[in-house]
Structures are given as C-alpha cells and as structure tokens.
Amino acid sequence: MPFPCSRSPLSHVAASRRLLLAGAFCACALAAAPARAQEFALFGGLLAGGGGRSYAWAFDYQEGLGRYAAAGFAWYNEGHIPNHHRDGQAVQLWGRLPLRENRFVISAGVGPYRYFDTVAATEGRGYSNSHGWGMLMSVRAAYYTSHRWLAQLQVNRTQVFSGPNTTSLMFGIGYQLDAPDTPGPRDRAAGRAGRVTANEVTAMLGETILNSRRSPTALGGSLEYRRGIAKYVDWTATYLYEGAKQSVRRNGIASQVWLTRAFLDDKIALSAGAGAYLTLNERDIRGRPGEGDGRVSGIASISASYRFDDRWLARVTWNRVVTRYDRDTDVIQAGLGYRF
C-alpha cells in the first residue's frame, strides 16, 4: 500500500501540538531572566530531501565552552517528506568566530543524530517505526542585540545510515539566559554549589500520540518520583499510563537518568533524560495481550518545571517511547508536584 506524503487532519493537529510544546519549553527558558545557562532558541524553515520538500523546525540549547567553542542540544523535526516523517535529537560541538565586537557570530557544529522515522511498511501494516543514527551538520550566522535577544540564520545537513539525507534552511529567534556584560555570547555558564534537585513527586495528565499514519491520540497520565543524584544529574522512576483507547492501550514503568539545569534562582529547571520503559500491560483492539506486553522499550524525554515555593512545583514533560514493534508514541503531559 503506498504511503502518502500528506497526512490526515488529525496528524497535522498532532504535529501542531508538538510544535506548541516546543514553544512552551522556549517560553519557560525565556522567563528565566538572571539564569545560569546561555542560549535557547526556536527555529523554523524549509527542508528538501528524499525527492520532496517540507517544513523543518527545531529548538536548541547552547552553552559556551570558551570564546571559540560551545556545546549544544537540539530537537530537530524534518517534517513530512515522501514516505518519511522523521525527527530526533542531536548533541553538537560548535566552533564559533565572534566578529564586530561580538555582535555578529559565525559558527559551525557537528554531532551524532538519533532519529525516529515513521515510514512505509514493506509488509503487513501500512507503516513502521524506524530508528537509526546519523550526523547533523550545521552552519549558523547570529546577530546579538543589546537586550539578550538574537536573530539566527542556519543551514542544516543530515547524513543518516538508512534513509534519505536532507538539507534545511531555518530562521531562529534566541534569548541569552545568562546576561553578558557586553553584547555577544558568554564564554562560559556560571556554576552552582549544590544539586539542582532534592526529592520530588509529581502527578501529570496529558495526551498520548501514536506515531502512525493517522497519529491517533488518547488521554494518559503518570506518577513520577525524581531525585537528584549529582549536581546536574537526576534519576526518575515513573508509572506511565498511556491511555485506554483502542489505538493506544499501554502502561508501564520507566527509569531514566537526566541532565538538569536550573535558572531564575532555581525557580525554573530544564532537563533531558533517557532510559528504559517496561510495559506492564498492553492490549490490542480486541482486548487481547498486545505484542509489547512485558517487553522493555527505550524512552527519551525533555522536561521543564516551575517551582512556586520550597514545596510545590508545576511540570511539563514530553516523552518519546521507542519500541521495536512499531508502537512508538509521544506522551505529552503536565501536572503538579511536591518537593521534599
């Protein structure tokens, strides 16, 4: 069965929700005025590859390693080219050249790219979830204003081991989370004395999106315990309920390790994590045990929290469940937590 380039209206809504969540993470970062990190940006633009054209978007966190170097994390979405709906995460090492009294910066970055792709199935189902590795190479020109804001123009090139390579041109708006003494990028981020996190318990509700041709959704929830195990490292144990609709009927337990940064006198924290997800119960359309029942899958997540006081916090989390049986999901949830 041919795999169409265009998606159903429901899948376009799901894609819009993912983009809105990316904007929400950017909003959390931009709210962090006297922060302890460096730059956060949201990009959007056009992409070509695989015999077609589409959109592309990304959000990017970058931290200085000195005047001429930086490290960055990006969540990169390659849109909907023919037979492929691909996105993923990349960690890049950047070289940068400040010009014109640091107001204009030219930089180039490269790093591993872990991608997740919904593709046409060779047999059976109309789709399959393909995962793989590649490289993300980027060239960027950035202009720094006098008020922490920066405008960026960036070209990306993906080279993957299986699937089409793509090229995108994107425009981005960024914000410096750690205010520099003069316009331009900071050389390094400020340090901290103690751990970002002590102990937290958070209950969340939200939406589960099955990564298929139609992207059906279901209401889900979770209960998370989070503990700081090092200055910038958290560990979580989570019961994850993905929903009860026929298309998405799965629940399980996840264990993850997170890299975490705190801003605005520790009121806001951003983190990225990865780990394992054990399916306790999965049912198919007829209510019988599903293919994933009792299996271990991967899970990768990003999360943002706002701490109201010493005890209470709000959290939003985007989980990507990565399976080996074509049941990948995006689980996007928000809720209230307690610190102790």
Show which residues each predicted segment covers.
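Gram-negative (and chloroplast) outer-membrane scaffold detector with strong preference
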Residues: L65-T122, S222-G287
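Residue-level signature of outer-membrane beta-barrel architecture
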Residues: E63, G95-L99, Y143, R157, ...
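Bacterial N-terminal signal peptides that target proteins for export
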Residues: F3-A22
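Short glycine/proline- and aromatic-enriched beta-strand/turn motifs that initiate or cap beta-hairpins
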Residues: A35-I81, G95, R103, T166-I229, ...
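Repeated loop/turn-to-beta-strand initiation elements of outer-membrane beta-barrel proteins
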Residues: E39-F40, R67-F73, E101-I106, Y143-L153, ...
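Transmembrane beta-strands of outer-membrane beta-barrel proteins
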Residues: E39-G45, G72-Y76, S107-Y113, Q152-N156, ...
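Residues that define the transmembrane beta-barrel architecture of outer-membrane proteins
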Residues: R53-W57, H85-V91, H131-M137, N165-L169, ...
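Extracellular loop and loop/strand-boundary signature of outer-membrane beta-barrel proteins
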Residues: L46, E78-I81, E123-Y127, R157-Q159, ...
